[in-house]
């Protein structure tokens, strides 16, 4: 949450050097993310879920994988799936919290009613784990939780990474 107006601090030389060293691995990272995204696209074909749109002339780096839940989501609503993933130990996020919901901007008089489309998106979208080294078992676990009946309880198997 943004409580007050802040500054945009620039990165240090050390951070720049680290970034440059990571560029050598960029193609590998993107390739791994594409593999993860391919599995999500294949496994999450659910009527109530809209998967990320990819134009045929563009190549995404998939820094996020956002699921957008439709009005007809029923038991697979955004909040239900979000809570089931979180309760199961999976790190799931809302991307992005609209600016008018942050205390700094709401105090300036910005209201939800001023931005109905942003509010709809916020209430329907979640980001699921997307990183190059997610294991097949971890990704399968995420998929199973999303596709499951809402009454089913999940516990993360021992040995899963703390990156969740």
Question: Model-found features: residue ranges?
Answer:
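PLP-dependent aminotransferase class I/II
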Residues: 1-164
């Amino acid at each position: 949450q943004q409580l007050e107006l802040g500054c945009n601090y620039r990165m240090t030389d050390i951070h720049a050097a680290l970034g440059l060293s990571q560029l050598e691995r960029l193609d590998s990272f993107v390739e791994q993310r594409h593999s993860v995204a391919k599995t999500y696209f294949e496994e999450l074909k659910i009527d109530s879920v809209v998967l990320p749109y990819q134009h045929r002339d563009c190549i995404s780096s998939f820094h996020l994988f956002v699921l957008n839940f439709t009005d007809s989501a029923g038991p697979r609503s955004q909040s239900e799936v979000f809570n089931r993933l979180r309760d199961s130990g999976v790190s799931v996020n809302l991307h992005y919290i609209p600016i008018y919901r942050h205390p700094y901007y709401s105090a300036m008089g910005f209201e939800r009613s001023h931005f109905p489309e942003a509010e709809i998106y916020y209430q329907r979208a979640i980001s699921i784990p997307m990183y190059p080294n997610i294991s097949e078992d971890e990704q399968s676990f995420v998929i199973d939780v999303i596709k499951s009946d809402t009454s089913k309880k999940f516990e993360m198997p021992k040995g899963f990474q703390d990156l969740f």
